[in-house]
Structures are given as C-alpha cells and as structure tokens.
Amino acid sequence: QRQSISDTTGVYWLHGPDPCVGPRCQAEPTHHEDKFGWFPIILAMVISSFGGLILNKTVSKQQYQGMAIFTPIICGVGGNLVAIQTSRISTYLHMWSTPGVLPLWMKQFWPNPCSTFCTSEVNSISARVLLFLVIPGHLIFFYIIYLVEGHLVPNSKIFVVFYLLASLIQVTILLYLAEVMVRLTWHQALDPDNHCIPYLTGLGDLLGTGLLTLCFLINWLLRSEAGLDGFSEPASGP
C-alpha cells in the first residue's frame, strides 16, 4: 500500500499541474512579460545580424584587414555604455514617477539633444561622463591591440582619428536614443531595462560595424592615393 501511495504521488508530480503555473498566469505583469518579453530580444538579434552581414562581406578583403579585431571592441564599448545610461534613466524614473506617467520635465518624447548632453540635470551629467570615457577607453584598447596584433593594425594616424570619431558618433547616437526610448517605453508602462537595452545594444552592433567599415574604407582610399601601405610592418624577430 505504501508503494502504491508512493507511485501515485510520483505520477502526480510528473503529470500533475505545476503549482507555480496558476499564480504566474494570474499575475498580469508576469503574464505580460512572458508574452512580450521575448520580442525585444529577437528583434535585437535581427538588428545585430545586419552588422554581422557587413562584417562577413568585408572581413576577407585586403582593405578591411584587421577589422575583425576592432569590431568586438567598438560594439562592446558602445553597448555597455548605453546599457549603463539606460539603467540609470530607468532607475531615475522609478524613483521619481510611476510606470505610465512621465515626470513633467520629461514629457517631451524627442528631447533637444542639447538637453541630453549639456544641462545640469543628473541624466545629462551621466551622459557626459560616459561620453568622456569613450576616447580614453578606446585608446587603451587600441594600444593593447597594437601590442598583441600589431601587424594587423592600420599604421596610420588618420585611421586612429577616424576610429575615435566613429566611436564618439556611435556612443552619442546611442545615448540620445536611450533617452528617447526610455521615455517611450516608460510612457507605455513597460520596463525600460527589459525593452530598451536589447534594442540599443543591437543598434550599437550595427552602428559600430558600419562606422568601423567606413573607417577602414576611408583609410584605405587615402593611403592608396598616397601610395602607402595601409598596415604596420610585422615586428622583426630576434
């Protein structure tokens, strides 16, 4: 009889209803996240895949030699910085408002870019700090790459200038879009962390890869006109 009860209990736990299913289905926010939470991730993968297509088309060509090394750097730095800013704005809204209601000073969905970067407001200060980190951070990564893979690094000051400019453009666009998207998602009573960060990191990959491609192309064109080799010479052995 004990064996029968044990078997019956086992069958119930294997085939019976999950005790967590009922409460989760009844919880509206959880049900909403289950239903729509995957959409930003899937769409972000689609957006990011376009950057992968660009890389796939260019990485095997001589003028883009070394691009595969720089792509994870520019995409990773931009994605991480915009994720920090998105979480910062989201936390600010959680402190000062309720989902679905924007503070009076954030009612405008498309703010002036100057208000995003040039005011004394706390989110604007945060955006400036992150923007100021771009050039020093990329210079450090650039130097490390040069030490490790020097023969694949374009030996041109012009490339360094364009690379840093592309990084600034990428992060500037992403930080502004973070401000816009957080306001839009908050107005729709959605969690900005879950719905904005995937989109913005996907856009960061696409922007970073596209701008990096332009950097290599411009560097190759300028050095071709000057009749110079576009890459540094391999270090001679002992």
Model-derived regions, located:
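Membrane-lumen (extracellular) interface motif
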Residues: Q1-V11, G22-K35, F50-F70, I140-V161, ...
